[in-house]
Amino acid sequence: MSAFVGKYADELIKTAKYIATPGKGILAADESTGTIGKRFASINVENIESNRQALRELLFTSPGTFPCLSGVILFEETLYQKTTDGKPFVELLMENGVIPGIKVDKGVVDLAGTNGETTTQGLDSLGARCQEYYKAGARFAKWRAVLKIGATEPSELSIQENAKGLARYAIICQENGLVPIVEPEVLTDGSHDIKKCAAVTETVLAAVYKALNDHHVLLEGTLLKPNMVTPGSDSPKVAPEVIAEYTVTALRRTVPPAVPGIVFLSGGQSEEEATLNLNAMNKLDVLKPWTLTFSFGRALQQSTLKAWAGKTENVAKAQATFLTRCKGNSDATLGKYTGGASGDSAASESLYEEGYKY
């Protein structure tokens, strides 16, 4: 089997490799309007376009954060927004060495014939949308598939359906110049132990890479965004070193070394937990052929959001909080995080939401 080599092949490989630079990671700022509304409600801020723009501007203009970031995932609205000075966000990011990306899926819907499992929408007109996003400056994309652990879940139907959806998305992106971030998220919901999560994660990833190969996806021009292997949300917590061992083992068994980087989702962990777990993985003394870094949304933004609280006078304080988290995660990609990236209790607060929708 030979991988697809289109006119963008060299660019895709270069972009994916850059995003996976050790010491850098991705800020996921692609929350849908509905999801950002929930975040705003928690700080009593109205969910209107000007407030969403203000938050994104706060994040994208934070002094000192650019060396810690290689990419930012944007929601479609944000791709076309500007700073208050009139500079497009995309331009601002690119000038500072941060690659703009775009969320392209349209959310999940129930998968008929299953026990509440889901499939992801958005393949219709995806090629045309990718062309538009490329013209607007985006160079990578994200698509989230969601799987759950239960007595009989994930079902084979759900695993295959979601793997094929991710593969079709990935090849369409590559044909149109965007590096696909492949995100098969195994939710933490449930009372299962870490061994169960490891087994399911391995099964899911094996199916995903089989589908990517079947669709001739150029693996060197992709990134993987998986869940960390953890016990279920209703089970006792385990140490970061245990999570690191199970997660890296699952990845070593399933993810080809052609993939340049693995950018973890935080999956409702607290900011501090997510950083400590990433750090433990990078400290693990085993062969890891890919960069292990972050693509965090809630785990980069939560304490920043609280510090800001929608008030202009709090912007500098909120940006300092954001810088602290960015630096902590940058250190974690190198296995050099020493803990306590924020003395703020918000950093240790669980961000778990059952059946999380983006």
UniProtKB/Swiss-Prot annotation:
Query: Looking at the record's lineage, which domain of life comes first?
Result: Eukaryota
Residues recorded as binding substrate, renumbered to this chain, are 39, 266-268, 298
What InterPro entries does this protein's entry cite?
Aldolase_I_AS, Aldolase_TIM, FBA_I
Q: Which residues carry this modification: N-acetylserine?
A: 2
The UniProt entry's GO CC annotations, sorted and at most eight, read: cytosol
Cited NCBIfam families: FrucBisAld_I
User: Under which name does UniProt file this protein?
Assistant: Fructose-bisphosphate aldolase 5, cytosolic
Q: Which organism is it from?
A: Arabidopsis thaliana (Mouse-ear cress)
Q: Which gene encodes it?
A: FBA5
